[in-house]
A protein has these predicted regions:
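Short glycine/proline-enriched turns and hinge-like loops at secondary-structure junctions
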Residues: 73, 142-144, 168-172, 210-211, ...
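A short, charged helix-loop
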Residues: 214-240
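Flexible, small-/acidic-enriched active-site or ligand-binding loops
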Residues: 145, 193-224
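Short Gly/Pro-enriched turn/cap motifs at secondary-structure boundaries
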Residues: 138-141, 165-168, 180, 205-212
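N-terminal glycine-rich flavin-associated loop
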Residues: 94-114, 140
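Alpha-helical interface subdomain recognition
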Residues: 1-88, 98, 110-115, 122, ...
Length: 376
């Protein structure tokens, strides 16, 4: 049965025709292209890279950026795309988030004209894939403590250090790498195949299995001055990228929660126990479903208001953190309740609930720590 949406408070009435059309496009892509293959991808720990060109054609990559072939969507439209992609699987949403918010955004915001012209059209179309190298083995929630270094050597820079838990790392044509120099924290575009730059994929994950996660290593990796983003100086630059990513996660979590709720609702209607009655006829089950839809509705309204503020240029980083913190925690609770309602069936991959539950676990701290969002 095709997904019709979860809207118990007429939230759709707050969306424009253009926003509804964008959501329908993303919803159709999720239904027709992602869902038929995502269970096998999750089983096989494989990212469906065959979908990348189509996501580029649909304008999903760098969707809310302008120029260089980007779709120029509003931030609400971009959020709706994130919602629908995560409803299918977080691995697909994460790919799009990293490509747009963590690679294309810093190039767009801090890059030179030559860097923008060279990379943005290729990244937008999916002809090139990027990754974001910030997290280190000893510094995850505290990026200010990074040990990766950039040392000027004539007209070049020499990079040394390690990055880990890097989405898209093993498939990336270019890495957006952050390192400490005498001038402060700087950003560099390091291409695949650069001497001294190596990548190893992280295996054995219980979560985000339909996503590539890697470690990056830099050993006297020499890049030219043209690889440095001239407008990126200090920790504020990478932190601004994280705010872009958190915004997308906040919307995506709503999609995962919707899928868990709808799965539990349909299951509880079809599942009959105790004299042949649907388990949905019991008040205990009804209370759980009512709690889920109430929390989803609040999360929808929070995401929509955040999107409106962002489109007006008024959304603050702390507000983005609140959006992401609230909505991911809500989605995790919905996934756990849904798994409970499905009983033993909840742990099988015949249903998407356990996949969402596993995927949402690292989304709670990522990027950069659940407990750190509101600390001074």
């Amino acid at each position: 049965m095709a997904f019709r949406g979860v809207d118990y408070f007429c939230v759709d009435s707050l969306l424009s025709e253009e926003e509804l059309m964008v959501r329908q496009t993303a919803r159709r892509f999720a239904e027709e292209r992602v869902l038929p293959l995502i269970r096998d991808c999750y089983r096989d720990a494989r990212f469906p890279s065959e979908l990348i060109p189509e996501m580029g054609e649909l304008g999903f990559l760098g969707a809310n950026l302008h120029g260089y072939g980007c779709a120029g969507m509003s931030n609400v439209e971009y959020g709706l795309v994130m919602q629908e992609l995560e409803r299918a699987d977080s691995g697909v949403r994460s790919f799009v988030s990293v490509q747009g918010a963590l690679v294309m955004y810093p190039i767009h915001a801090f890059g030179s004209g030559e860097q923008k012209s060279r990379w943005l059209p290729r990244l937008q179309s999916g002809r090139a894939v990027g990754c974001f190298g910030l997290t280190e083995p000893d510094f995850g929630s505290n990026p200010a403590g990074m040990r990766s270094t950039a040392r000027r050597d004539g007209d070049a820079w020499v990079l040394n250090g390690e990055k880990t838990w890097i989405t898209n790392g093993g498939m990336a044509d270019v890495a957006m790498v952050w390192a400490r120099a005498e001038e402060g924290i700087l950003g560099f575009l390091v291409e695949r195949g650069t001497p001294g730059y190596s990548v190893s994929d992280i295996h054995g994950k219980w979560s985000m299995r339909a996503s590539v996660t890697s470690s990056l290593s830099f050993a006297d990796c020499r890049v030219s001055e043209s690889a440095r983003l001239p407008g990126a100086k200090g920790l504020k630059a990478p932190l601004s990228c994280l705010s872009q990513a958190r915004y997308g996660i906040g919307w995506g979590a709503v999609g995962a929660a919707m899928d868990c709720y709808e799965t539990a609702r349909q299951y509880s209607i079809a599942r009959k126990q105790f004299e042949g009655r649907p388990i949905a006829s019991h008040q205990l089950v009804q209370e759980k479903l009512a709690w889920m839809i109430t929390e989803i509705t609040k999360a929808q309204l929070l995401a929509l208001h955040a999107g409106r503020l962002k489109d007006q240029g008024k959304l603050e980083p702390a507000q983005v953190s609140m959006l992401k913190r609230n909505n991911v925690a809500m989605a995790l609770d919905c996934a756990r309740l849904s798994r409970d309602l499905l009983g033993a069936n909840g742990i099988t991959d015949e249903y998407p609930v356990m996949r969402h539950l596993c995927n949402l676990e690292p989304a709670l701290p990522a990027p950069k720590g659940f407990e750190c969002f509101f600390t001074p």
